[in-house]
C-alpha cells in the first residue's frame, strides 16, 4: 500500500508551475482517434489517468511515443475492439471513447465508467445525444454497446437537460465527422470545452460557439493530424493558490490563466487574501487575518465544484462562520470527517458544509476518498502541526502531476512511501 507522509507546520516559499489540464487531456487523447494521421499533444500532465488512457489506446492499436510532457499519438492502427473492464473501469473519462469510436467506426463497446464516487453523474445526457444522432444503446454485462448499424451518425439538434461538461465534449467529438449539422443547446462553457474544440478544429473540424451555451458542428468527412498545446489546469492552479494562501510565505504560481479562475479569485479577494495577478502567474503573499465566507458552486463561469474541496483548508484559517454548498455533486463532502479528525470545526448540515474558524489542525491518519478530497487533505497536512498519513492516495495521483516533487521544491516535508 502506498501512502503520503507529511510533517506539517512548515512555511513554504518559492515558485510552482501548473501542468496541463487534466480535464482537457482526458478528452483530447480519445479525440485523436478521429484523426487520419499523427497528433502531437504538448503540456500533457504526468498523472495516472493519462497513463491509463495511453495503455488503453495502445491496446486498441495506437502507436504512442512520450517525451516528457509531449505525447505523439498515431491513431491509424486503432481497431474497434471491445473494452469491457480493467483500466476502463477505474477511469471516468473512459466515456469519451464512446464519442470517438462512434465517430470513427459507428460503434463502440466500452466498460461503464469509474472514477471518483461523487453522486449522480449525467451519463444519460451522453446517451440521449448519441441516440438523437442515430445510435442505439444496449448493455452487455458491465459494458455498454453503442451502434449505428452500419449507418453514419447524423447531425441533430440536441438540448442538454442539465449543463454537463462531459456530455458537451462527447457530443462534439461524435458530431465532428457526422453527416450534416449538429447543434448543442444549453452546452457547458468550461475552458476545457474550448480546448477540445480547438484541437478538433485544428484537425479540420468545423465547430463554432465553444465557450458559449450554443455550439454548432458541421460534420466533415475526415480529420487530419495536428499539434496542440494543452491549456493550463485551472483546478491545479486554484489548489496551489489556496495552499499558498494557507501556509505560504510568498509563493508564485506560474502557467496560470487568470480568466479561467475569476470566480475563485473573487472569493479569495472577499476573504482578504493578498495576491498579485500578473500576465501568466499569480503571486500569493504571506497572509494575516482572513475573513470567513460562504460559497455555492455552479457551472462555469461560476465557482468550480472541483475547487470546493481544495479551498476548504484555507477557509478553516479564517475568522468567523461560513458554509459551502455544492450544487453540482451532492456527495462532495467526504473530506469533512477527515478534516474533523485533524481537529477542524467543520461538519455537514442538510447537504451543506458549515465551518467556524480559525482552526489549528493537528496531524492525523486520514483517507482520501476522491481526487479533490485528497488535495484538501494534502493542504491540511501541510498546515497541521505534526505528522499526517494519507492513504488511498491513488485518487490524488490521478489528477495532480508530480505533486510530491512540486511541494518538496517549496520546502514541504512530504514523501510518498510504499508499505
Curated annotation (Swiss-Prot):
2-(S-cysteinyl)pyruvic acid O-phosphothioketal PTM sites in chain numbering:
116
Residues of the active site: 116
Q: List, alphabetically, the CDD domains matched.
A: UdpNAET
Query: Which GO cellular component does the record give, naming just one?
Result: cytoplasm
One GO biological-process annotation of the entry reads:
cell wall organization
Q: Which reaction does it catalyse?
A: phosphoenolpyruvate + UDP-N-acetyl-alpha-D-glucosamine = UDP-N-acetyl-3-O-(1-carboxyvinyl)-alpha-D-glucosamine + phosphate
Question: Domain of life here?
Answer: Bacteria
Residue positions annotated to bind UDP-N-acetyl-alpha-D-glucosamine are 92, 121-125, 306, 328
The pathway it acts in is: Cell wall biogenesis; peptidoglycan biosynthesis
The main location is cytoplasm
Extract the InterPro entries matched here: Enolpyruvate_Tfrase_dom, Enolpyruvate_Tfrase_sf, MurA_subfamily, RNA3'P_cycl/enolpyr_Trfase_a/b, UDP_GlcNAc_COvinyl_MurA
Which residue ranges does UniProt annotate as crossing the membrane?
none
Enzyme nomenclature, EC number: 2.5.1.7
Q: Which GO terms describe its molecular function?
A: UDP-N-acetylglucosamine 1-carboxyvinyltransferase activity
Cite the binding residues for phosphoenolpyruvate. 22-23
* Protein's cellular compartments: Cytoplasm
Keywords from the UniProt entry: Cell cycle, Cell division, Cell shape, Cell wall biogenesis/degradation, Cytoplasm, Peptidoglycan synthesis, Pyruvate, Transferase
> Which family does the entry's similarity section mention?
Belongs to the EPSP synthase family. MurA subfamily.
What does the UniProt record say this protein does? Cell wall formation. Adds enolpyruvyl to UDP-N-acetylglucosamine.
The protein depicted here goes by the name UDP-N-acetylglucosamine 1-carboxyvinyltransferase 1
Amino acid at each position: 500500500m502506498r501512502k503520503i507522509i507529511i510533517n506539517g507546520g512548515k512555511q513554504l516559499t518559492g515558485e510552482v508551475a501548473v501542468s496541463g489540464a487534466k480535464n482537457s487531456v482526458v478528452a483530447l487523447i480519445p479525440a485523436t482517434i478521429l484523426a487520419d494521421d499523427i497528433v502531437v499533444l504538448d503540456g500533457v500532465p504526468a498523472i495516472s489517468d493519462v497513463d491509463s488512457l495511453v495503455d488503453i489506446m495502445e491496446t486498441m492499436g495506437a502507436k504512442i511515443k512520450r517525451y516528457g510532457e509531449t505525447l505523439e499519438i498515431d491513431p491509424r492502427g486503432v481497431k474497434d475492439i471491445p473494452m469491457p473492464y480493467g483500466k476502463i473501469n477505474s477511469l471516468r473519462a473512459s466515456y469519451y471513447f464512446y464519442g470517438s469510436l462512434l465517430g470513427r467506426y459507428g460503434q463502440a463497446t466500452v466498460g461503464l465508467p469509474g472514477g471518483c464516487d461523487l453522486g449522480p453523474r449525467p451519463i444519460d445526457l451522453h446517451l440521449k445525444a448519441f441516440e438523437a444522432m442515430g445510435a442505439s444503446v444496449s448493455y452487455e454485462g458491465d459494458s455498454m454497446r453503442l451502434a449505428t448499424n452500419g449507418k453514419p451518425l447524423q447531425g441533430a439538434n440536441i438540448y442538454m437537460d442539465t449543463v454537463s461538461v462531459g456530455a458537451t465534449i462527447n457530443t462534439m467529438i461524435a458530431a465532428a465527422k457526422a453527416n450534416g449539422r449538429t447543434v448543442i443547446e444549453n452546452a457547458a462553457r468550461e475552458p476545457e470545452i474550448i480546448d477540445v474544440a480547438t484541437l478538433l478544429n485544428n484537425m479540420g473540424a468545423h465547430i463554432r460557439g465553444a465557450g458559449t451555451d450554443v455550439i454548432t458542428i458541421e460534420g466533415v468527412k475526415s480529420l487530419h493530424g495536428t499539434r496542440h498545446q494543452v491549456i493550463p489546469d485551472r483546478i491545479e492552479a486554484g489548489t496551489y493558490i489556496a495552499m499558498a494562501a494557507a501556509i505560504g510565505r510568498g509563493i508564485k504560481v506560474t502557467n496560470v490563466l487568470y480568466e479561467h479562475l475569476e470566480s475563485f479569485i473573487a472569493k479569495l479577494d472577499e476573504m482578504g487574501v493578498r495576491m498579485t495577478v500578473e500576465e501568466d502567474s499569480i503571486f500569493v503573499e504571506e497572509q494575516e487575518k482572513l475573513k470567513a465566507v460562504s460559497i455555492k458552486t455552479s457551472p462555469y463561469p461560476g465557482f468550480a465544484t472541483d475547487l470546493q474541496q481544495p479551498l476548504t483548508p484555507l477557509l478553516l484559517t479564517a475568522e468567523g462562520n461560513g458554509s459551502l454548498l455544492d450544487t453540482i455533486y451532492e456527495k462532495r463532502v467526504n473530506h469533512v470527517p477527515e478534516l474533523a479528525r485533524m481537529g477542524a470545526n467543520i461538519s455537514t448540515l442538510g447537504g451543506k458544509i458549515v465551518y467556524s474558524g480559525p482552526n489549528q489542525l493537528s496531524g492525523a491518519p486520514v483517507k482520501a476518498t476522491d481526487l479533490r478530497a485528497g488535495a484538501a487533505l494534502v493542504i491540511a497536512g501541510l498546515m497541521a502541526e505534526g505528522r499526517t498519513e494519507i492513504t488511498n492516495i491513488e485518487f490524488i495521483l490521478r489528477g495532480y502531476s508530480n505533486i510530491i516533487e512540486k511541494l518538496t521544491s517549496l520546502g514541504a516535508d512530504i514523501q510518498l512511501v510504499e508499505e
